Amino acid sequence: MQTDTSNLSARSCRFCVMSPLRTLLRSSEMRRKLLAVSASKVISTVKRKTSCSASGQKPTPCLSSTSKAQISPDFSFFNSVSSSKIKTFHEETSLFQIFIGMLCGNT
Protein backbone atom coordinates (compact mmCIF):
# COMPACT_ATOMS: atom_id res chain seq x y z
CA MET A 1 0.00 0.00 0.00
CA GLN A 2 1.48 3.33 -1.05
CA THR A 3 0.63 6.54 0.75
CA ASP A 4 0.90 9.99 -0.69
CA THR A 5 3.19 12.01 1.60
CA SER A 6 3.31 15.15 -0.56
CA ASN A 7 0.33 16.62 1.24
CA LEU A 8 1.88 15.82 4.62
CA SER A 9 5.21 17.40 3.71
CA ALA A 10 3.45 20.51 2.41
CA ARG A 11 1.63 20.88 5.70
CA SER A 12 4.77 20.34 7.80
CA CYS A 13 6.86 22.71 5.67
CA ARG A 14 4.30 25.41 6.19
CA PHE A 15 5.85 25.80 9.65
CA CYS A 16 9.36 26.26 8.22
CA VAL A 17 8.58 29.77 7.11
CA MET A 18 6.60 30.65 10.20
CA SER A 19 8.56 32.29 12.99
CA PRO A 20 8.17 30.67 16.44
CA LEU A 21 7.69 34.18 17.86
CA ARG A 22 4.77 34.70 15.48
CA THR A 23 3.27 31.44 16.70
CA LEU A 24 3.77 32.63 20.28
CA LEU A 25 2.02 35.91 19.51
CA ARG A 26 -0.97 33.99 18.17
CA SER A 27 -1.56 32.33 21.52
CA SER A 28 -4.47 33.74 23.48
CA GLU A 29 -2.34 34.43 26.55
CA MET A 30 0.15 36.50 24.57
CA ARG A 31 -2.67 38.36 22.81
CA ARG A 32 -4.24 39.14 26.17
CA LYS A 33 -0.95 40.55 27.45
CA LEU A 34 -0.32 42.59 24.31
CA LEU A 35 -3.76 44.13 24.46
CA ALA A 36 -3.63 44.82 28.19
CA VAL A 37 -4.49 48.45 28.73
CA SER A 38 -3.57 50.40 31.80
CA ALA A 39 -5.95 53.06 33.05
CA SER A 40 -3.43 55.82 32.37
CA LYS A 41 -3.26 54.90 28.69
CA VAL A 42 -6.94 55.32 28.03
CA ILE A 43 -8.10 58.82 27.25
CA SER A 44 -11.73 59.10 28.13
CA THR A 45 -14.15 60.47 25.60
CA VAL A 46 -14.28 64.22 25.80
CA LYS A 47 -17.23 66.19 24.56
CA ARG A 48 -16.22 69.50 23.09
CA LYS A 49 -18.58 72.39 22.79
CA THR A 50 -17.91 74.84 20.02
CA SER A 51 -19.81 77.79 18.74
CA CYS A 52 -22.17 77.01 15.91
CA SER A 53 -23.26 80.31 14.50
CA ALA A 54 -25.18 80.83 11.32
CA SER A 55 -24.47 84.10 9.50
CA GLY A 56 -23.64 86.36 12.44
CA GLN A 57 -26.11 84.99 14.97
CA LYS A 58 -25.17 84.56 18.58
CA PRO A 59 -22.89 81.52 18.94
CA THR A 60 -24.76 78.56 20.31
CA PRO A 61 -22.79 75.88 22.09
CA CYS A 62 -23.28 72.55 20.40
CA LEU A 63 -21.65 69.18 20.28
CA SER A 64 -19.30 69.23 17.33
CA SER A 65 -17.17 66.16 17.91
CA THR A 66 -15.99 63.65 20.42
CA SER A 67 -12.46 62.42 20.71
CA LYS A 68 -12.25 58.67 20.58
CA ALA A 69 -10.63 56.69 23.34
CA GLN A 70 -7.05 55.91 22.46
CA ILE A 71 -5.74 52.50 23.47
CA SER A 72 -2.10 51.65 23.11
CA PRO A 73 -0.63 48.17 23.60
CA ASP A 74 1.10 47.63 26.92
CA PHE A 75 4.51 46.07 26.34
CA SER A 76 5.66 46.40 29.96
CA PHE A 77 5.41 42.63 30.47
CA PHE A 78 8.52 42.25 28.28
CA ASN A 79 10.53 44.07 30.95
CA SER A 80 9.76 41.38 33.50
CA VAL A 81 11.60 38.70 31.51
CA SER A 82 15.26 38.38 32.51
CA SER A 83 17.97 38.49 29.86
CA SER A 84 19.02 34.90 30.64
CA LYS A 85 15.50 33.68 29.89
CA ILE A 86 15.50 35.62 26.62
CA LYS A 87 18.87 34.12 25.69
CA THR A 88 17.58 30.63 26.49
CA PHE A 89 14.45 31.30 24.43
CA HIS A 90 16.55 32.38 21.44
CA GLU A 91 18.79 29.31 21.76
CA GLU A 92 15.78 27.00 21.91
CA THR A 93 14.17 28.84 19.01
CA SER A 94 17.32 28.42 16.90
CA LEU A 95 17.50 24.70 17.68
CA PHE A 96 13.81 24.35 16.85
CA GLN A 97 14.29 26.11 13.51
CA ILE A 98 17.25 23.84 12.67
CA PHE A 99 15.19 20.77 13.56
CA ILE A 100 12.24 21.90 11.43
CA GLY A 101 14.63 22.75 8.59
CA MET A 102 16.06 19.23 8.74
CA LEU A 103 12.56 17.75 8.63
CA CYS A 104 11.70 19.82 5.59
CA GLY A 105 14.98 19.06 3.82
CA ASN A 106 16.32 22.61 4.03
CA THR A 107 19.73 21.66 5.48
From Swiss-Prot:
UniProt miscellaneous comment: The gene encoding RFPL3S is located on the opposite strand of the gene encoding RFPL3. Its transcription may play a role in RFPL3 transcription regulation.
Annotated protein name in UniProt: Putative protein RFPL3S
Tissue-specific expression: Strongly expressed in the testis and weakly in brain, placenta and pancreas.
Organism: Homo sapiens (Human)
